[in-house]
């Protein structure tokens, strides 16, 4: 804090400098809210000035650019904050950190929105966020190593991989809580995961062969909505090209900072032609999301799986296929799901419905796995469903900062831990 900094350095605070610090704080408060919704790209310096009640030049007296304001907002929350594990009174300490984060106004909203928006390499906070993930991974690995030496982490766990998956699932849980604050809560989920980490990997394997008749799988409820389009083939082809180019723009520039003029210029058509196919940018966004769901392979066909175990073990293949064959669709989903956490975003209801359906479906899948004896009795199907969805989304976000990350390999390792081979 500015006051604390002045006290520590012995700097004498004058009335003018105090007023300046207060104004800077007000600018950062307003910017933080605007960077969450409508988002960094869609927010101008004039928007920030209006929110604070200053002129454009009044803001420029404190910050030279919007980029400088963004970095100041990010630094406000500091670097990765991990206590010395030896000072933690109970457990691994991750629950205490999550509780502390939950008490920081705007933390959840800002970092969830920024994690997706800054994933694009051209974003001014990209390098800071990428470095933050590296810093978090290194510190968390050391933290888990100390915890394992104290008997709080099961023997045989790959600590660096566990640290990476923990950070990814944590990001995903924060995102889920913003869409489904009732069913998903970050702190209890982390507390339950902490108890599971105390067991060796693959604990609780069932003895004997699998059942002759596996438990029935739930009806798939992840299908995209219809986007029925009539008309001539040329018109349908142009509509498809518009959706494809809009997908690329939304993935790289975000929805908020992409205009219909931008889309028209990318496609090479007039705005009137664009509006002939889509009445508004919201309609175009809906078509992009529908096309994404229709093309990507994360909506696994349950009918093709013979059992819950088989279904869950094939998820890694789908993730690898998505990253290799449809990286743009993975990108647009990651960016938009983070951007749309604000309730007034046009895509908020879409992601809220989709997450609710996905959690219900995977809860039923894990219940079937438990009925088959594949999911150990000490694991809760509701928790496992939320953790899997959060992990997958968090891994995709991290993949956008590090394209060498193998999302499929981490999903496979997680499923192997949750569904151990039969003894």
Identify the meaning behind each predicted range.
Residues 4-6, 110-112, 156-176, 186-196, ...:
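Hydrophobic alpha-helical segments that form the core
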Residues 22-26, 30-72, 238-241, 245-287:
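Helix-turn-helix
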Residues 103-127, 325-348:
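Amphipathic alpha-helical segments used for helix-helix packing
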Residues 105, 123-150, 345-372, 383:
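Amphipathic alpha-helical packing segments from all-alpha helical-bundle domains
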């Amino acid at each position: 804090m500015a006051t604390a900094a002045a006290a520590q350095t012995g700097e004498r605070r004058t009335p003018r400098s105090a007023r300046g610090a207060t104004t800077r704080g007000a600018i950062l408060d307003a910017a933080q809210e605007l960077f969450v919704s409508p988002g960094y790209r869609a927010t101008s310096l004039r928007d920030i000035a209006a929110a604070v009640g200053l002129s454009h030049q009044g803001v420029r007296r404190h910050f030279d650019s919007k980029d400088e304001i963004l970095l100041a907002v990010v630094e406000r929350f500091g670097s990765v904050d991990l206590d010395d594990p030896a000072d933690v009174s109970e457990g691994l300490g991750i629950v205490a950190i999550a509780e502390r984060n939950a008490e920081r106004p705007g933390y959840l909203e800002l970092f969830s929105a920024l994690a997706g928006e800054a994933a694009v390499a051209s974003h001014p906070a990209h390098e800071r966020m990428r470095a933050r993930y590296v810093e978090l991974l290194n510190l968390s690995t050391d933290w888990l190593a100390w915890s394992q030496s104290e008997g709080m982490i099961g023997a045989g766990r790959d600590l660096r991989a566990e640290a990476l998956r923990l950070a990814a699932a944590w990001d995903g849980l924060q995102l889920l809580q913003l869409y489904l604050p009732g069913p998903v809560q970050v702190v209890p989920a982390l507390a339950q995961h902490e108890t599971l980490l105390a067991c060796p990997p693959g604990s609780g394997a069932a003895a004997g062969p699998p059942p002759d008749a596996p438990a029935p799988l739930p009806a798939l409820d992840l299908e995209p909505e219809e986007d029925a389009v009539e008309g001539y083939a040329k018109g349908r082809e142009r509509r498809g090209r518009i959706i494809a180019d809009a997908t690329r723009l939304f993935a790289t520039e975000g929805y908020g900072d992409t205009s219909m003029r931008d889309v028209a210029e990318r496609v090479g058509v007039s705005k009137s032609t664009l509006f002939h196919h889509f009445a508004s940018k919201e309609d175009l966004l809906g078509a992009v999301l529908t096309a994404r769901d229709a093309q990507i392979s994360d909506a696994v066909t349950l009918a093709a799986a013979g059992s819950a175990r088989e279904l869950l073990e094939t998820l890694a293949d789908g993730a690898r296929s998505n990253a290799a064959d449809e990286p743009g669709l993975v990108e647009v989903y990651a960016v938009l799901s983070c951007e749309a956490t604000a309730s007034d975003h046009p895509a908020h209801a879409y992601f809220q419905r989709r997450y609710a359906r996905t959690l219900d479906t995977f809860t039923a899948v894990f219940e079937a796995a438990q009925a088959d004896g594949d999911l150990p009795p000490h694991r809760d199907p509701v928790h496992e469903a939320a953790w899997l969805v959060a992990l997958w989304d968090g891994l995709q976000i991290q993949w956008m900062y590090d394209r060498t990350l193998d999302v499929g390999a981490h999903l496979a390792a997680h499923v192997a831990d949750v569904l151990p081979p039969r003894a």
